[in-house]
Structures are given as structure tokens and as C-alpha cells.
Amino acid sequence: NALPTPNAAAFYTSGLTSNEAAFCYQLFARQFGTNNLPDCSNMCHESSGAALNEAIGIGKGCVTLEDFEHADGIFIMGQNPGTNHPRMMTVLERAKHSGATIVALNPMAEPGLMQVLNPNPQEYHGAHLLQFPFKMLFNIGTPLSDLWLPLRPNGDMAALRGIMKEMLAEEEKRPGTVFDREFIATYTDGSEAFLAHIRATPWDVILRGSGLTREQIRAAAEIAMKCKRIICCWAMGLTQHKNAVATIQEIMNFLLLGGHIGRQGAGPCPVRGHSNVQGDRTMGIWDRMNDHFMTKLGREFGFSPPMEHGTDSVETIKAMREGKIRFFFGLGGNFLSATPDTEYTARAMQNCRLTAHVSTKLNRSHLITGEIALILPCLGRSEIDRQESGDQFVTVEDSMGIINPSRGHLKPASEHLRSEPAIVAGLAEATLGARTTVDWKGLAANYDRIRDHIEHVIDGFENFNERIRENVFYLPNEARDRRKFNNGIGKAKFIISEIDPHDLEPGQYLMMTVRSHDQFNTTIYGLNDRYRGVYNGRRVVFMNAEDVRASGLQQGQFVDLTSHYRGETRVARHFMVAPFNIPRGCTATYFPEANVLVSINSTADRSNTPVSKSVVITIAPSAEPAAAVAELHRTLKASAQVKNRP
């Protein structure tokens, strides 16, 4: 309340926040008077939402889990499901058993893209029951990818353009046998201009941009032409590039040519990570919610929400650095480690008057603070949440648009812990006082009341409390369910974009950040990445073996990495060289260690997502190899101490 303006505050949300907590949180921020609601989606799938909203009128995927069992083609792009979405491996295995052909487009030969060994005995039924001990004993998995395309980072648009160029050539030879002309004529706009654009794209631009051969592209096109029901999956390997939105719209162009949306076994599938990052957006966690939502929110609670756009994550960091935002509130998450340009972001956080975090465990964001810092411990979702009206449950929305209940069963770690909804409601009541029109105590006492308000404000939640007690349910998705595209013109759009060649100067490499297998987002559980053969360390740079030799380096050598962005340089020291099956001129490092190399000013067009997957770097032998060895020893010692704690 001491701030000069409500816009001097920012309310950040982690994707682990429940629907009920998120709804209360955005209501608190807007009754306070600001739309400064940055969230973790700004760093990951913001590009997906921007791309899909323009193309098909909804920022979510358009497939169900059941669709995977009916797809005959699945294209996995910029995603490593074995490490980042392990539960998806069962879905892909079932799809393979149902006859699907899988094409993987990824710079790295990830084991999780190649095969799956399912450790769950319940997945083996009937005649397959005896396969379980045999597969476990001899380590025999189910092959996944039928074709792997080792493109360069950000080569996806060029690869897709090449696939469609091959398909167009066949369609012109045999009209009506490759493209779904009836669907295109009935449900889309801009097809003729887009097809002309494909014809005009030279093959040398496609091959240079993708890093693939004509034969590899032809092989993928032949698979696509045989398939009648295609699903395209993608994750941050696509969303964190300068042209990420355009690339995802190229995926939609590919799907639209075959009519692969709005029918069983087909559609776009952006695969999100956190358990409720999609649900938080549905609940209103966004700095620029539409007028329809804001009008209904204001009507439900009898106030006038602020209508000017707020700040996203990158804009919030810059505003803190400039002194425009003086109060930062984090509802979960690890903001410092999730964001780019670590040193810049740290100084921005330290420029605040007050930083506060609601958390279940300590993380690095609690160490880099404003002048005053608060840590508000809260119940984990696995713990019993008992309020005035009795035991409570919350809900989340997954990547398929399914609303699931979540109820804790463990005794709370402390009798003093409060739940996220209770903390938000208590803070809102104390902060807003007589200004509020909300019965915050009543919401905290019984989450059914929160869900009643959600039902009144957000479409698709009719009879929310009754339905969620009966079963999980899908939210409506008109693009998927009715082939209705609410994008302003009522038809799915073919959108034309140019291929970015991303040419490098001699001695430069294109770096992308990735996660290890012992890691979930910013939470690091150990120093091993067994699927890539890395043990006891994370400061690793994966390089093509020929690049290692050509640059005079050796496996295991310590090097310093320098990023280059518009005349700016940033340095990350003491990384160990690790040869890997990755295209020449390309490298990979672990997130968040390499976030220091990502410029705060390098963001995707239209989504403002940090460009963490195409960072231009140079590599030099470490200036202080002895210090690098000492740092490694300290890391190993600290890791051993953590493991040996009782």
C-alpha cells in the first residue's frame, strides 16, 4: 500500500499453482489495481499461445490422450519426452502398438526419442504379460522413432517447408491425393498464397536452414503423405527461438494441408511441463487478458478491473531494474533460475524494496532479494489441506485441457503451514481492507466457493463442483470439437513466414539449453544425466566430435563460453567438453547454468519469450583450469553431503 502506484507491484505465478489459488491470486492483483501478472508460461509456451490464437483461435492444443491411439503419424519436434515428459512415453508406446509411425525432429539423438522400456507391470496385459520380466531382464525396449531428422537448432521451419514442398509436388502430379482439398476450401483462409510461397522457396534455402539433406526431407514427406491422421507435438525446442511463433504457425500450415485438426487422431499438441501452467492461464494469470474475461470478472465481484496491459516476465525484470517495479511477489517457482540473463535479473531483484515468495522448499530465488525479503512457507499439494469447512481439494488443467482434482493425503510438515489459497486470501484481505468487494475469509474457508466464482466467470466450468466430484472432464475446445476457429475471420489461417538462415561467423556455434534427466524444470535432483552419459557434473557443453577436433579441444577439457548478442558479450566459465551426436556448429548446455549467456534483450517476436535455444557463442580453453577443477570438487563434495543427510 506504500507504493506510488499499483503498477509498481508484480505478481508472479509458477505453473504448479492450482486453479483455485491462481483465480484468487489474479483477483487480488486486479483488485489491487494492476495487470502485472508475469508467469512461467512467459518463458516457455507463450510462443505456442500466440501462434495458435492467430492461426486457429485458441491458444491450446487440440488433441486428447485418446487421439494418440488413433493417430497413424506422430511428429515430435523440439521435445525430449524421455527426460522432460516421461509420462508421455506410455502414450507414445501405446501409439506404436496401435500402428503409428513416429518422426522425431531434434538436433540431439535423445535415447527417449528412440525407444521406451516401460517399467510398469500393469501396462502388460494378457498374452503380453510374460514380456514384462523378459524386457526388464534383457533391457529390451519398444522402438519409438521410425525416422530421426538431426536438424540444426531452429531448423524446424525449414524442415517443414521442405516436407510440404515435396508434398506439393506430389499433389500437383496427382490432385486430391495428398492434400485435403475439401477441408482447405471449407475451413481455411490463405491457402493459395501459402502454396505459392512454398513454390517460391528455393531448395538451397531449405537445406541450409534445416541442416538436413534432400533425402532426409523426402523420407519424412513420404511418411506424411501415407498418414491420414497426424499429431504434431512440440515443446521448448521450438518455443524459445526468435521466430518461434512463425515456426509453430508453420506446423499449423502443415496440419491444415491434410485437414489434421478437428477429427480423431489428429491435431496440434504443445506439451507443457508444470502440472497447471495451462490452467493458470485459463484462470486469468496473464498480463493482457481479453475484454470478455475482464468484463465477467468485474461483474462477478462488483468492481472495475484495470484494462491496461501489464508486464510479462521479461518486462517485469526490466521494470525492476529501472526502479519502476519495487515490489515482487512470487507464488511458487524459482524466478531467478527460470529467467534469462541471471546477473541482470539478480540485480533487478535486488533493486526492489520488498520481495516475497510463497514456497514449499528453499531455492536460489530466496537468496537474491530486495531490501526486505519474506519467505512464506505453504502446504504442498501432497499434504492434507484442512480449512474451516473441512478437508479441501484443488484442481489443475493438463496439456489436453482435462480438469483433474488434486487432494493431499499426507500429514502437514507443520501445524503452522497454510495453503496457497489461504495465504493469498489472507494477504488480499489485509492489503485491500475496506476497498475489496470479495469475501476472502469465505473463499479460504471453503474452496467450493472459489469454484462457484470460477464457474460464473470462465466459460466451460458449468456445474464445476458437481462435475469435478463425479469425474475429470475436458474443457470445451471449439477448434478440436467443432472445427470452429475463433480468430476473427472464422477460418483457420495459413500464415506466411520467411525462413531464418541464422548464419554464423567462423568460430561461432549455436547453443541451446537443455535439461538433464535428474532435473524437473529448475529443480535439480542430482548431478547425473545417465541417458546422455554424464555423471557427477552439470557444467558441460555438448559438441559435435568433429568440431571438438577441429577447434583443438579434447573431451573433458575445461572451456569458457562467451555469448554474442548485438555487440554484448556474456561469459560462463569452467564448462567441460563432452562430444555428442549433435550437428556440426551446434552445442548444448544445461539450464539454468547457461542462463547467464542469454541476453534479457533477446526474445521471440510477438511472444517475448527468452531465446534460450539459439544463442550464438564462442568457445575457448578455460583461462583458469585449476579453478575449474577446484569448483568441480566443491560441487561433488556438496552433492555428497546432501545425499548423506539423514
Regions found by a protein language model. Name each.
Residues N1-R272, G298-R480, N536-R573:
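Cofactor-pocket helix-loop regions in the catalytic cores of large enzyme subunits
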Residues S14, A235-G237, V271-G273, C378-L379, ...:
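Structured loops at beta-to-helix junctions and adjacent beta-edge loops in soluble globular domains
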Residues Q122, G284-R288:
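Surface-exposed loop and adjacent secondary-structure segments within mature catalytic domains
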Residues A246, K441-R530:
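Long, low-complexity segments enriched in small/aliphatic residues
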Residues N276, G526-G537, E593-D605:
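Flexible, small-/acidic-enriched active-site or ligand-binding loops
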Residues A572-N581:
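Basic-flanked hydrophobic alpha-helices used for secretion and membrane insertion
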Residues N581-A594:
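Short, solvent-exposed secondary-structure boundary/capping segments
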Residues R606-P646:
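Long, low-complexity intrinsically disordered regions
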